[in-house]
Amino acid sequence: MSRRKMIYEGKAKILYEGPEPGTIVQYFKDDATAFNNQKKATLEGKGVLNNRISEHIMLGLGRIGIPTHFLKRLNMREQLVRQVEIIPLEVVCRNVAAGSISTRLGVPEGDQLPRSIVEFYYKKDELGDPMISEEHITAFNWATHQEIDDMMAMTLRVNDFLCGLFTGAGIRLVDFKLEFGRHYEGDMVRTVLADEISPDSCRLWDLETNEKMDKDRFRRDMGNVTEAYAEVARRLGIMKESGQGAANGDVGKGDAAK
């Protein structure tokens, strides 16, 4: 059996050629990074959890009409996605002050923001993913005005969906990061949600205690990172109540790609 062709390896995922034209296999690694790759570790089972959580969320978003690259989960670590041309932006939606908005603007961490705030960042690790304006985006042709409008509208819809989903699970959605891509269908092109939505890309706090249940546990050396991710999965109904496995296998064993 011939090995699949690797297209790209990022910090948390590997992309392989898919079985059909226009498809990609997205493999979730156990690697954890922070501070633009300056801090690294391997957290056994993290990739499995992120795969399952992102699948659960992408399916929910698809049901309310938000176009995504997600097609189906293949196994515990992989999912089949549409091939898209990634727009080189990170779109961050903030509901509660935390992270860089607290340090930049002096807003105390944990303060509810006056309204949800959407920010754009240029996706460039070597530059530290700088925050940019819509003027920068259109001036450098990273995206069109229409694509910006589409990303803004979808981000706010995703925020509404996620707030409801996580509140129902006893979790406070502090903020999250999205990425988008261009999906070409013949002569048509549309903006779709890409990448993943997981505790790697969201700040999630327990609704009662404000305990962190996301990647900040790794950034701040708080420990129990995978356990926190597993608790998010359990509350979303993805894992068994015992916390020892997911619907189709044990998340704690770091299943290899099939």
Curated annotation (Swiss-Prot):
GO terms for cellular component: cytosol
Pfam families according to UniProt: SAICAR_synt
Reaction(s) the record says it catalyses: 5-amino-1-(5-phospho-D-ribosyl)imidazole-4-carboxylate + L-aspartate + ATP = (2S)-2-[5-amino-1-(5-phospho-beta-D-ribosyl)imidazole-4-carboxamido]succinate + ADP + phosphate + 2 H(+)
Keywords for the protein's UniProt record, in alphabetical order: ATP-binding, Ligase, Nucleotide-binding, Purine biosynthesis
Keyword Transport recorded: no
EC number: 6.3.2.6
Broadest EC class assigned to this enzyme: ligase
Pathway entry: Purine metabolism; IMP biosynthesis via de novo pathway; 5-amino-1-(5-phospho-D-ribosyl)imidazole-4-carboxamide from 5-amino-1-(5-phospho-D-ribosyl)imidazole-4-carboxylate: step 1/2
Family: Belongs to the SAICAR synthetase family.
NCBIfam families assigned to the protein according to its UniProt record, in alphabetical order: purC
Protein name: Phosphoribosylaminoimidazole-succinocarboxamide synthase
Organism: Maricaulis maris (strain MCS10) (Caulobacter maris)
Gene: purC
